[in-house]
From Swiss-Prot:
Binding-site positions, substrate: 15, 46, 90-91, 133, 155
Biological role stated in the UniProt entry: Phosphoserine phosphatase that mediates dephosphorylation of phosphoserine in the serine biosynthesis pathway. Also able to dephosphorylate other substrates such as phospho-L(or D)-threonine, with lower activity. Shows phosphoserine:homoserine phosphotransferase activity by transferring the phosphoryl group to homoserine using phosphoserine as the phosphoryl group donor.
Family named by the database record: Belongs to the thrH family.
Cofactor: Mg(2+)
Keywords: Amino-acid biosynthesis, Hydrolase, Magnesium, Metal-binding, Serine biosynthesis
Protein name per its UniProtKB record: Phosphoserine phosphatase ThrH
Native source organism of the sequence: Pseudomonas aeruginosa (strain ATCC 15692 / DSM 22644 / CIP 104116 / JCM 14847 / LMG 12228 / 1C / PRS 101 / PAO1)
Record lineage: Bacteria, Pseudomonadati, Pseudomonadota, Gammaproteobacteria, Pseudomonadales
Single GO MF descriptor: phosphoserine:homoserine phosphotransferase activity
Length: 205
């Protein structure tokens, strides 16, 4: 029994915060876990900036509604779901993800939750647990699943290390250099091949 675990942003959909930064012209919101590996530090910075500019959840959702999955992502998810159980492990928030998950056919998503006040202001967030992607992989392994994981960033590397097989996809050069133990690919066709290679079953493209 095998489970495919995928990161969401940068792997299947654009980086939501980068798209939001471009739309609002606030460059400081372009920082991601690629730049600031400590997610808690990154989120506190984002919330402070949102507050300084008076931006509410509705403003962010408006931008997300204009985003589309990366080219080829929908077909890739369909291909993967025919061959594996698929779970998206993401550091996004349920409040952000709905429009994009709909376009991907609503695969299972494990992520975090925002805290919103009565005026639609983002006042905080609830992380599901510490190192949630790795903890999810540990849980799947305890159920005797073989886990193959793919991600693009620092915050994916503990998940990739914990999985039976880890794959870097669309990762920047600094992450590829720092984690040479993982195969690094940049197209969905190559990612399919890595999943087939990592599988304990005899599967075809």
């Amino acid at each position: 029994m095998e489970i495919a675990c995928l990161d969401l942003e940068g792997v299947l959909v654009p980086e939501i915060w980068i798209a939001f930064a471009e739309k609002t012209g606030i460059d400081a919101l372009k920082a991601t876990t690629r730049d600031i590996p400590d997610y808690d530090v990154l989120m506190k910075q984002r919330l402070r900036i949102l507050d300084e500019h008076g931006l509410k959840l509705g403003d962010i959702q408006e931008v997300i509604a204009t985003l589309k999955p990366l080219e080829g992502a929908v077909e890739f998810v369909d291909w993967l779901r025919e061959r594996f159980q698929v779970v998206i492990l993401s550091d996004t928030f349920y409040e952000f993800s709905q429009p994009l998950m709909r376009q991907l056919g609503f695969p299972t998503l494990l992520c975090h939750k925002l805290e919103i006040d009565d005026s639609d202001r983002v006042v905080g967030y609830q992380l599901r647990q510490k190192d949630p992607k790795r903890q999810s992989v540990i849980a799947f392994k305890s159920l005797y699943y073989r886990v193959i994981a793919a991600g693009d960033s620092y915050n994916d590397t503990t998940m990739l290390s914990e999985a039976h097989a880890g794959i870097l996809f669309h990762a920047p050069e600094n992450v590829i250099r720092e984690f040479p133990q993982f195969p690094a690919v940049h197209t969905y066709e190559d990612l399919k091949r890595e999943f087939l290679k990592a599988s304990s079953r005899s599967l075809s493209l």
